[in-house]
Amino acid sequence: MKLSRQLILLLAILSFSACQKEEGPDTDTPTGYESLQSKSEKRGVAFNFSQLPDIDIPNLGPACSWSYNWGVNLSAEASALFAQYGMDYCPMAWNANWNEDTFRAFKKAHPECKYLLAYNEPNLTDQANMVPATAAEDWGRLVAIARELDLKLIAPAMNYGTLEGYHDPWKWYDEFFAIEGVSWDDVDGIALHCYMGSAGGVKQFLDGFKKYGKPLWLTEFCNWSSNNVSADAQMKYMVETINMLEADPDVFRYAWFIPRGHGESQCHNSLLGSKSPFALTDLGKVFVNMSTQDKSLWYKAGTVIPAEHYNSCTGAIHLAPTDDSVGVLSLTDLKKDTAVDYQIEIPEDATYTLTLRFSTYFETALRVSLDGSSLGLADLPNTDYKWDIFKVDLPLSKGRHTLSLSGTTAFPVSLNYLSINKL
């Protein structure tokens, strides 16, 4: 009953107005804020950290929980940095040409190792190049070493193939796991590769493997739908796809291809620069700093909330390195049919000020909702792409709530941060 009275009061008194900047410093803009979200347990990269581990791992480690390099071993320097940044390394048997003692030595040196990845794209002629019968001949040996070393085995990594008769990855899987001595009970996950050019295409591909009832590992992905993918298109693809992967409970892990590689001029997929100081690219900044959709985080009143750290999102929202004076990323393209949710924790019944740092190029509006109920529209003026402050006072009740911001027109809004402060 208390919540109902609160919503009625909000609907009755809520009025929105933009705070216009005055000459001089903008005292409403914080000098800095920190990330409070937890690292994603899913997020990783497919990469060999052999050349610049002392630079590359500190750059990616704050966001990455795991990695693999298509081989067995990891350098001592990289291993130490993986431990420092809480990254899990997964060795791989790339094809049937592997040695038990190599895996035994690795496991002895790395008792924390939990997974073993099986053959890399066996239905591609320039990769593992194994028909199901050939893979089955080696499979018992691989299952045996995984059990001996207490490693969870992940099924061969599948993509659309070039091996005659096995372009269809489902056909390869179905034939392989029907062979005597091979069983779905042998594996604890399915590895997949996908280079489609849209998040929807990736989702459709992944959904096709859910029939096997195993956790999905997307161990290679980026937009490589052609050899002419722009940096902007790649960034939008990455944000949309990672948002989908983080939200899908059937996706256990995913790994971006590739932090640094030869395809940069073709599809702009590099997370790391190829020249000194080898820093994060703009794409890398987004990969490292975008939302992990952390469901355990509740932002307390008085905390500056980076707009890119939404708890969940709807529609094709995008992110980019911010051009504001504070922050790392900005949320862009918040318009009709898109929304972002933030979990907030209010310490006591009181009136609080909601502050939005925004920019637009058209007069537009955002709908503000609390726990699924609309509180009203925030009418935003045209700021000519300049950053401005919007404020409104809200009476809020003690407890945890979900604050939602959704677009209402075709004209996009960019957000840098938001905050809720007691009057």
Task: Show which residues each predicted segment covers.
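Aromatic- and acid-rich polysaccharide-binding/catalytic face
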Residues: 91, 120, 172-225, 257
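Bacterial Sec-dependent N-terminal signal peptides
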Residues: 16-39
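Extracytoplasmic
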Residues: 294-423
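Sec-dependent signal peptide recognition
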Residues: 2-9
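Aromatic-rich peripheral "rim/lid" segments of glycoside hydrolase catalytic domains that contact
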Residues: 88-90, 248, 252, 257-308
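N-terminal carbohydrate-binding/catalytic regions of secreted carbohydrate-active enzymes
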Residues: 44-113
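Active-site groove signature of glycoside hydrolases
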Residues: 110-132, 154-164, 185-194, 218, ...
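Active-site clefts of carbohydrate-active enzymes
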Residues: 155, 161-164, 211-238, 257-273
